Amino acid sequence: MTNIRKTHPLMKIINHSFIDLPTPSNISSWWNFGSLLGICLVLQILTGLFLAMHYTSDTTTAFSSVTHICRDVNYGWFIRYLHANGASMFFICLYIHVGRGIYYGSFTSMETWNVGIILLFTVMATAFMGYVLPWGQMSFWGATVITNLLSAIPYIGTTLVEWIWGGFSVDKPTLTRFFAFHFILPFIIVALVMVHLLFLHETGSNNPTGLNSNADKIPFHPYYTTKDILGVLLLILFLISLVLFAPDLLGDPDNYTPANPLITPPHIKPEWYFLFAYAILRSIPNKLGGVLALITSILTLTLLPYLYTSKLRSLMFRPLTQLCYWMLVSDIMILTWIGAQPVEYPFITIGQVASILYFTIIIILMPMSTMLEDKMLNWN
């Protein structure tokens, strides 16, 4: 008798995706982060669902309802901090996942890469709207500042902002629609993840060498399921430690003050995972220029398949481009630090230099080093 997982229409899909999937035998732990992102997504949807049962999306009661969750609901504080810090874990895994994709040349699988970029934008939008929901000071002012950026769009900007706000300022209609979008977007993300996996399984996984691995594949289960469990345990250990010992480490103290349109916080800043993009936005004195730089900072990922045309897919054997890559990683860390600093000397200058360097490395230095390496290997 044939195994049911190989014959049943539904089980067959799961079998081909997670059990009998032919996987390169040499993929390293950097390939763990895809499954970790799946775990994070499930965790966020579950904790979010329980939070939504007690949350009210009304400006007068939103802040109180979050306080009520933490004080009166059984393990409400735990669910709330799991959700808040789970978002941080999500972005850590997401950035490592994208970084691995750049390092090992995964962007040559164009469809998978482009769906991944759409996923990145969707997750960022979801996280931004989630940050507005507790209706603290930073929630309110963050929403005001970021949505206001759309007013830089010529002709339709102001109308667009008022349409998103549902009035002439961030108020009850804004909070209600942000809650609605924050609830529905994770399910759209799940659908996009399925498309992402569909395209990935069309071509098969990349591997650290960047070479074709068709001659050396092993089944995903039990080898990589076991390997992924280690990553999952480490992720859970780190997340639970954060939730139980330092739940507010990555948050902003200003968000423990109820939203007040009459008092502006001294430093308006988003969550830590958006700080690098926020630093690029702030480093340009012009509003429209800043918005364009902000969007371009992530959209440059779509250019990678066209910019890096080396004969070698992976950076494993390319020391010059490796140097540029780690310069880029360092630069993003500097931008993250700058985004959290006040707008004053020397932070403005450091931010501007780091922003110029960010685009220079991606658009000029890395493609040039790629061409130079090909030249040195007499491949061009």
Swiss-Prot record:
Bilayer-spanning residue ranges: 33-53, 77-98, 113-133, 178-198, 226-246, 288-308, 320-340, 347-367
CDD domains the record matches: cytochrome_b_C (cd00290), Cytochrome_b_N (cd00284)
Residue sites binding heme b b566 per the record: H97, H196
Cellular localisation: Mitochondrion inner membrane
Amino acids binding heme b b562: H83, H182
Residues that coordinate or bind a ubiquinone: H201
SUPFAM superfamilies documented for this protein: a domain/subunit of cytochrome bc1 complex (Ubiquinol-cytochrome c reductase), Transmembrane di-heme cytochromes
Membrane topology qualifier: Multi-pass membrane protein
Subunit structure comment from the entry: The cytochrome bc1 complex contains 11 subunits: 3 respiratory subunits (MT-CYB, CYC1 and UQCRFS1), 2 core proteins (UQCRC1 and UQCRC2) and 6 low-molecular weight proteins (UQCRH/QCR6, UQCRB/QCR7, UQCRQ/QCR8, UQCR10/QCR9, UQCR11/QCR10 and a cleavage product of UQCRFS1). This cytochrome bc1 complex then forms a dimer.
Similarity comment: Belongs to the cytochrome b family.
Miscellaneous information on this protein: Heme 1 (or BL or b562) is low-potential and absorbs at about 562 nm, and heme 2 (or BH or b566) is high-potential and absorbs at about 566 nm.
Protein name per UniProt: Cytochrome b
Species, as recorded: Cricetomys emini (Emin's giant pouched rat)
Gene name tied to this protein: MT-CYB
